[in-house]
Amino acid sequence: RAVGGGSLELAKALKEGEQASQAQLLGRLYQDLEQLEREIALRAESLQAVTEYLSRQKDRLVATPALWPTEGYVSSRFGPRTSPFTGQPQHHTGVDIAAPPGTPIRAPADGVVTFAGTLPGYGHALVLTHGYGFKTFYGHNQRNQVSKGQTVKRGQVIALVGNTGYSTGAHLHYEVLLNDQPHDPLKYVVDEGQRPKL
């Protein structure tokens, strides 16, 4: 009988130990699952942050005026030069691209036409706003092909090269502005095959 009673006690102790081990195992499993859930949430946040960053970079790239706007050669570069009208030194805020009258001018990036009209000195002119602080300006156009408020896509024809305003021959006066400050347009052309003749 002592043997039988001991066996029952041993069986009971083993069963309690097994239940305790199962409870510990379930407790550890629960903790591991909670930790895994926290890690998944952190990774999801990181993935979301990376996705948002890449989306912003893509939008910025689409807004960057990286396409050369017309065929021709650069007849006057950005920076210091002598004015063709006064003979005095001046800062040229863009580049002049000499081309035959009627040569298509294309949008260098997606954007919205924020000015389409006539300006003193520049004749028929356009301003495109691209986002991320970028704007581009086109002067001496023969004819504007787009209207104020119109959305344009990179590569779309927006005007034709002309000789309007104060001009010594058919050309496009092209400016790139970042936060309303003029920058050398040549610095934004990313396709080497697109680089203009200098």
Label the model's feature ranges.
Residues R1-R77:
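Non-catalytic extracellular/periplasmic "stalk"
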Residues A66-L198:
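Catalytic cores of peptidoglycan-degrading enzymes
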